[in-house]
A protein has these predicted regions:
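Extended recognition/assembly regions associated with phosphoester-bond processing machinery
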Residues: 1-66, 70-203
Length: 203
């Protein structure tokens, strides 16, 4: 099955017309503001607009988020939840796009404050198996993978540092793939990254 890696930090599966992304971390800026840090607003709106653009360009019928859609309980403010709900209504009405979520570790920490079906998510699972694909958040938590399956996950926020001449360095978000797995970069603009040191059979 084909997987198209997109420069917008997401992947596209043409056969099922699915955009796959991970680690948006909506509400992270609000979480920091709640803790007294002077973080400007706007990152959530920017990321949701990027998603709308990807869906429009590829005419995707489904958006599948492999975990950590939201960041923390204190960041799930009425404004953040309303913005995401409006996003879901927009893509469902304009392109008939369903929004599907695989639960991440951050969703599990939200408790009763997280009501996915009340904000426009059409399906919410611990993992989704659609042979040959196996969608999870953290692939290290799912060891019983069927033979021949290909795991698509997030959680790690992979980055790579490119060294230039002198002391020049550029750190970029990246996809990491082996023969049986694909780790997606963090989609959210206001997220950190983990610098990968890929082994020989990893790209």
């Amino acid at each position: 099955a084909d997987i198209v890696l997109l420069p917008g930090r997401a992947a596209f599966l043409p056969k099922t017309s699915t955009i796959v992304c991970s680690d948006i971390h909506l509400g992270k800026a609000a979480t920091f503001r709640h803790a007294g840090m002077p973080i400007p607003e706007g990152s959530e709106q920017h990321d949701l607009k990027r998603l709308v653009n990807l869906i429009d360009v590829h005419k995707a019928r489904r958006l599948l988020i492999t975990g950590d859609l939201f960041h923390a309980r204190s960041g799930c403010t009425p404004q953040v939840l309303e913005e995401f709900s409006k996003f879901c209504k927009q893509v469902q009405s304009s392109t008939s796009t369903d929004v599907v979520l695989v639960l991440g570790n951050h969703e599990r920490s939200l408790g009763k404050k997280f009501q996915p079906y009340e904000i426009g998510i059409s399906r919410c699972e611990q993992e989704i198996i659609e042979p040959p694909f196996h969608f999870v958040h953290d692939q290290t938590k799912h060891s019983n993978v069927q033979t021949g399956s290909f795991t698509i996950a997030g959680h790690v926020h992979p980055t790579i540092t490119i060294k230039g001449t002198g002391r020049d360095r550029l750190t970029c978000r990246c996809f990491v793939t082996t023969g049986t797995t694909l780790t997606l970069p963090a989609f959210g603009s206001f997220t950190g990254g983990y610098n990968t040191q890929p082994p020989s059979r990893t790209r």
